[in-house]
Amino acid sequence: MAELRQVPGGRETPQGELRPEVVEDEVPRSPVAEEPGGGGSSSSEAKLSPREEEELDPRIQEELEHLNQASEEINQVELQLDEARTTYRRILQESARKLNTQGSHLGSCIEKARPYYEARRLAKEAQQETQKAALRYERAVSMHNAAREMVLVAEQGVMADKNRLDPTWQEMLNHATCKVNEAEEERLRGEREHQRVTRLCQQAEARVQALQKTLRRAIGKSRPYFELKAQFSQILEEHKAKVTELEQQVAQAKTRYSVALRNLEQISEQIHARRRGDLPPHPLGPRRSSPVGAEAGPEDTGDGDSGIEGAEGAGLEEGSSLGPGPAPDTDTLSLLSLRTVASDLQKCDSVEHLRGLSDHVSLDGQELGTRSGGRRGSDGGVRGGRHQRSVSL
C-alpha cells in the first residue's frame, strides 16, 4: 500500500506521484468560454462586438462573392487573352516569313497578278453587299404586304356598320394607312439600294473577267503565293476574332468587378449613416449651467431655482410698488439668502467659480435690500424675474 503524505491544504498524495503546485495567494480566475473549433490560440483573433454583429448586412457577403468571382474570371480570361495574342503574333510572323520566301522564288509575276486578285476581292465584297440588300428589300416587301392586309381588315370593319362610325375601327384604319406608307417608302429605298449594289457587283465581275484574260500567264505562275496568302489570312482572321471575344469578356468581367465594388461602397456608406443616426446629436451627461453672476438664459432656469427666484422677484416688486416701508423680518431674509447660496452652489461645478465675487454682501440679509435699490431703472420701473446674484462666503 502506497504511503500517503500530508500536503498543505489537507490533501494526501501517494508516494511517488507528482502533486500540482499549490499557490495559496492565487486568485481563482473566471472560466473563459472558448469558441467552438477555435482552440486556445485564437485569443489574439479580432472578435466582432454584438453591435457590429447586429449591423452586418447580408448583402456584404453576396457582393464579396460577386467580387471574388469577377476577380477570378478576370485573371483567367486575361491569361487566355495573353496566350491568344501570343499565338496571333507568332502566326503572323510565320506567315510573313513564308510569304516572303515564296515571293522571292516566284519573282515579278506576283506584282503583275496582284490587280486581278484585288478585283476578285472587291467583287466578292460587292456580291455580299448585294445579298444583304436583297434581304432588306424582301423584308420591306413583306412589311408592305402585311400593312396592306391590315388596311383591308380595317376597311371591312369600318364598312360593317354603315349607319354608325366606330372610332376604334377608324383609329385602326388610320394606323394601318400610316404603316402602309412607311412600308412603301422602305420598299422603294431597299429597291434602289439593291439596284445600286447589283450594278457595282456586275462592274466588279466584268473587271475580273477582263483582268483574267489579260494576265492569264502571270495569274497561273503566282497562284501558289496568293493561295497560301488566303490560307494565312483566314487563320489570322479566326485568331483575331478569338482575341476580340476574349477582350470583350475581360471588359465585362471588369465591369462586374467595378459594380460589385461600388455596391460595397454604397453598403458601407449606408451602414455608417445608420450608425451616425443611432448616436445622439449631443453628448449625454449633465448640462453645464451658467456661472454665478452671469445672466441666466431661459433654458438654464431649473425647476429648483425658479421658486426662489420667483419669491425674490415678488419681494422686489412689492418693495418697489409700496415704496419705503417697514424692514422685512431678519429671519426671512437670512432664509432667502441661504437658499440663494445653496442654489448657486448646486449650479456651479466647483467653488472656484465663486472666487473674485464681491464681498459687499454677506449672509445677514443685506443682499435683498441692496438688490432692491439697485434694480430700479432710470424710468422708475423694476426688473422682475431674472436678476444677477453676487454672494460672498
Curated annotation (Swiss-Prot):
Function field: Functions as a guanine nucleotide exchange factor (GEF) for RAB11A.
GO molecular function (one): guanyl-nucleotide exchange factor activity
Family membership: Belongs to the SH3BP5 family.
GO biological process, one term: intracellular signal transduction
GO CC annotations on file: cytoplasm
Post-translational modification Phosphoserine, affected residues: 30, 49, 343, 350, 358, 362, 378
Superkingdom of the organism of origin: Eukaryota
Name this protein carries in UniProt: SH3 domain-binding protein 5-like
Compositionally biased tracts (Basic and acidic residues): 18-28
Species of origin: Pongo abelii
Modification type Phosphothreonine: residues: 13
Short name of one Pfam family: SH3BP5
Chain residue ranges for the region called Disordered: 1-59, 272-332, 364-393
Biased composition (Gly residues): 304-313
Composition bias type Basic residues, residue spans: 384-393
Key words of the record: Coiled coil, Guanine-nucleotide releasing factor, Phosphoprotein
